[in-house]
C-alpha cells in the first residue's frame, strides 16, 4: 500500500469528514478545534477554513441532498447551516438550537425536507428544514434509523414519533460463545450507514452497523428481527397501541442468521476492538463495498454484496477484500466517487489521510 496523502490544516484531532458526490475531489473535514477545512484533491493546499465551533469541537457534517452548496455543521448542542457556494467563503443561513445536550450525529433525508440531530441524552430532534422549525422529538429509545449505547438499533415511524422495530445486539445467543470480543466488549452501536437510493434499488433496504464488540452487522431493516416471546410481542387488544417489534440479532458470521442478516467479525478477518465508523463505497460499482474503521487502528474493506446476491455462506476471509493498518485509532471515514484518492480517513491525529482503494 502506498503512503497516504496527508491533508493539513487542523490544530486538534480530526472528528469527521464528508466528500462531495457532484464535485469529485472536494472534501470537508472537521476537528476538535471547531473548524471545518475544505480541500480540493486536485490542488495542493486547502481551499479555505471555516471557524464554526465557537471553541467547541465539530461533531458532525452533512451536505443538503440535491444541493451541495449547503452544508450542515453540528457543534455543542447547535446545528448551523451554511452556504458554501462561493467556494472560498461561507455564509451562515440558519441556526438550530433545539437539542439540550451535545449533538453527536446529524443527517438529512433524501428529499432534503428533514434533518435529524441525535444528542448524548438519547433524544433525536427532527427539524423541518424547509420551514426552519422543530418538527418532532424521538425520545426514550433512540431518524428513522438510530443506534445508541443501549446496544439497540431502532427503526422509527417518525410521523407518529414511536419505534416501529427494534434490534437488540446486546442479547447474546448460544452461537456467540466462541466470540470473546463480543463477551468482553458491549455491542454498543457506534455508527450507522445506509446506502444511497440507487444502491437500495439493487437490494432490500439495509443498514450497516458499527458495533462496540468489533462486529460490523449488515441488517435488512424491513425484515422482522428474531421474535422474543414475551407479553409485549403478543397481538395487541383492539383499541390498544401496538408495541414495536423487538428481537435479538444473532452474530453467527458464517451463515448470517435466519433473517438473512450478515455479521462480519474477527473470525472473518475483522476488527479486534470496537468499530467506530462505517460507510458504503461511492467509487466504482457504488455501494459494492462496506468500509469500516476501528479502535484497533484498522480499516477493513468488505464485499458485502455477494452475501445478499448469491447467499454465500463461505467461511474464512471471503468477504474481506483488504485491510489497512494505521498508526492511530479511526474516528471517521468517507469515500469519494473517483478511481484514486477515494478513501478519506480521520484518525485521532490532526492530519487527515487519503488512500486509494481498488
Predicted segments, located by residue:
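A short helix->beta-strand "capping" segment at the edge of beta-propeller domains
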Residues: 1-11, 43-45, 257-266, 314-321
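WD40/WD-repeat beta-propeller blade N-cap
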Residues: 7-14, 51-58, 64-65, 96-103, ...
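Loop/turn segments within WD40 beta-propeller blades
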Residues: 18-24, 61-68, 106-113, 118, ...
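Conserved strand-to-loop turn within each blade of WD40 beta-propeller repeats
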Residues: 30-33, 73-77, 111, 118-121, ...
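WD40-repeat beta-propellers
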Residues: 36-40, 79-85, 124-128, 153-157, ...
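Short loop/turn segments immediately following beta-strands, especially the blade-tip
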Residues: 83-88, 158-164, 220-256, 303-312, ...
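Loop/turn-rich, solvent-exposed surfaces of beta-rich toroidal or solenoidal domains
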Residues: 198-224, 252, 259-262, 266-309
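Blade-level signature of beta-propeller repeat domains, shared across WD40, Kelch, NHL, RCC1
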Residues: 332-358
Amino acid at each position: 500500500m502506498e503512503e497516504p496523502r496527508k491533508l493539513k490544516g487542523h490544530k486538534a484531532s480530526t472528528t469527521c469528514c464528508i466528500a462531495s458526490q457532484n464535485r469529485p475531489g472536494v472534501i470537508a473535514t472537521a476537528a476538535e478545534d471547531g473548524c471545518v477545512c475544505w480541500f480540493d484533491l486536485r490542488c495542493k493546499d486547502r481551499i479555505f477554513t471555516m471557524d464554526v465551533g465557537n471553541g467547541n469541537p465539530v461533531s458532525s457534517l452533512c451536505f443538503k441532498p440535491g444541493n451541495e452548496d449547503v452544508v450542515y455543521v453540528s457543534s455543542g448542542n447547535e446545528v448551523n447551516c451554511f452556504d458554501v457556494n462561493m467556494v472560498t467563503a461561507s455564509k451562515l443561513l440558519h441556526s438550530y438550537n433545539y437539542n439540550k445536550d451535545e449533538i453527536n450525529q446529524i443527517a438529512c433525508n433524501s428529499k432534503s425536507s428533514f434533518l435529524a440531530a441525535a444528542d448524548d441524552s438519547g433524544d433525536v430532534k427532527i427539524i423541518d428544514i424547509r420551514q426552519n422549525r422543530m418538527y418532532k422529538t424521538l425520545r426514550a429509545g433512540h431518524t428513522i434509523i438510530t443506534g445508541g449505547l443501549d446496544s439497540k438499533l431502532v427503526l422509527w415511524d417518525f410521523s407518529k414519533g414511536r419505534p416501529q422495530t427494534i434490534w437488540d445486539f446486546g442479547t447474546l445467543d448460544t452461537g456467540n460463545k466462541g466470540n470473546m470480543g463480543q463477551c468482553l466488549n458491549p455491542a454498543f452501536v457506534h455508527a450507522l450507514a445506509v446506502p444511497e437510493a440507487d444502491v437500495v434499488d439493487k437490494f432490500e433496504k439495509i443498514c450497516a452497523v458499527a458495533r462496540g464488540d468489533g462486529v460490523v452487522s449488515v441488517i435488512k431493516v424491513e425484515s422482522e428481527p428474531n421474535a422474543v416471546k414475551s407479553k409485549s410481542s403478543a397481538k395487541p387488544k383492539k383499541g390498544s397501541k401496538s408495541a414495536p417489534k423487538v428481537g435479538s440479532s444473532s452474530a453467527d458470521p458464517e451463515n448470517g442468521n435466519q433473517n438473512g442478516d450478515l455479521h462480519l467479525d474477527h473470525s472473518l478477518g475483522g476488527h479486534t476492538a470496537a468499530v467506530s465508523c462505517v460507510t458504503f463505497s461511492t467509487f466504482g460499482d457504488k455501494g459494492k463495498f462496506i468500509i469500516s474503521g476501528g479502535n484497533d487502528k484498522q480499516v477493513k474493506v468488505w464485499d458485502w454484496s455477494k452475501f445478499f446476491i448469491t447467499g454465500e455462506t463461505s467461511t474464512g476471509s471471503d468477504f474481506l477484500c483488504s485491510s489497512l493498518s494505521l498508526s492511530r485509532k479511526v474516528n471517521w471515514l468517507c469515500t469519494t466517487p473517483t478511481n484514486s484518492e477515494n478513501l478519506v480517513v480521520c484518525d485521532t491525529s490532526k492530519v487527515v489521510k487519503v488512500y486509494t482503494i481498488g
